[in-house]
Amino acid sequence: MEKLAASTEPQGPRPVLGRESVQVPDDQDFRSFRSECEAEVGWNLTYSRAGVSVWVQAVEMDRTLHKIKCRMECCDVPAETLYDVLHDIEYRKKWDSNVIETFDIARLTVNADVGYYSWRCPKPLKNRDVITLRSWLPMGADYIIMNYSVKHPKYPPRKDLVRAVSIQTGYLIQSTGPKSCVITYLAQVDPKGSLPKWVVNKSSQFLAPKAMKKMYKACLKYPEWKQKHLPHFKPWLHPEQSPLPSLALSELSVQHADSLENIDESAVAESREERMGGAGGEGSDDDTSLT
């Protein structure tokens, strides 16, 4: 399997807002992402409980954009298992209750592809979707998966969903032992639209921690599930297994937020169901589908 060389020399964050052309991330991009995941300066801690921490950061050049960073300690979950869970699109449909639809579109290289993901937003906001170029890199016992938004000619914005923009989103998985790891999730996303303050607050105080905990539960159940569902099929580890068609980078273009319709939802009030936690409230995760 081809691999990108991974250097460990420190690098500062690499700017991503001004991206003008579609490129598969290189070594410097992966180092920069790792550096930002590990950075502490400029981040405000908003949640820290039971091994899960959340930080937020306003983007100075555009105050409507916010970065969020979540970190979780995972006991009894090897780094390679968490890496598999994040890659396994069929398993995600089982454990991610927010997903509406998700599928891979095409392969770009042995460690990069293009995919579609749509998700449910807190009521009564409109649901969102995104097309992203995703790339991944094993770095010894650690792993990085990251993505950013692109435009694909066959998948234009849909009328029933708001097309969001991932400026840069990804995961850093760091092994801390044979059966333990730490995962850091870093996201800079333009959800397209003026969101009410309760959405931003709820994302950092409730939604992000809950999503991380649900991912952890899914990791614990993954080995048993995978044994019953094509146990040897892991194209993210064995690219020769990939059934995806190849796609040239020239077929894609960068998805800029300013080219999409802006939705003003700033005055939208939180629904009673969301305030009460809804059917999927804290502590009510339904794991019966993970079998």
From Swiss-Prot:
Phosphorylation at Ser-284 by CK2 negatively regulates lipid transfer activity, possibly by decreasing membrane association. PROSITE patterns: START. Residues 1-20, 260-291 are annotated as: Disordered. SUPFAM superfamilies: Bet v1-like (SSF55961). Residues 14-224 form the START domain. The modification N-acetylmethionine is found at M1. The modification N6-succinyllysine is found at K94, K197, K202. GO terms for molecular function: lipid binding. It comes from the Eukaryota. It is found in: Cell projection, Cilium, Flagellum; Cytoplasm; Membrane. Its main location: other. Keywords: Acetylation, Cell projection, Cilium, Cytoplasm, Flagellum, Lipid transport, Lipid-binding, Membrane, Phosphoprotein, Transport. Pfam families: START (PF01852). One of its GO terms (biological process) is lipid transport. The modification Phosphoserine is found at S253, S259, S284, S289. One of its GO terms (cellular component) is intercellular canaliculus. PANTHER family: PHOSPHATIDYLCHOLINE TRANSFER PROTEIN, START DOMAIN-CONTAINING PROTEIN 10. May play metabolic roles in sperm maturation or fertilization. Phospholipid transfer protein that preferentially selects lipid species containing a palmitoyl or stearoyl chain on the sn-1 and an unsaturated fatty acyl chain (18:1 or 18:2) on the sn-2 position. Able to transfer phosphatidylcholine (PC) and phosphatidyetanolamline (PE) between membranes. This is START domain-containing protein 10. It comes from Homo sapiens (Human). The lineage of its organism: Eukaryota, Metazoa, Chordata, Craniata, Vertebrata.
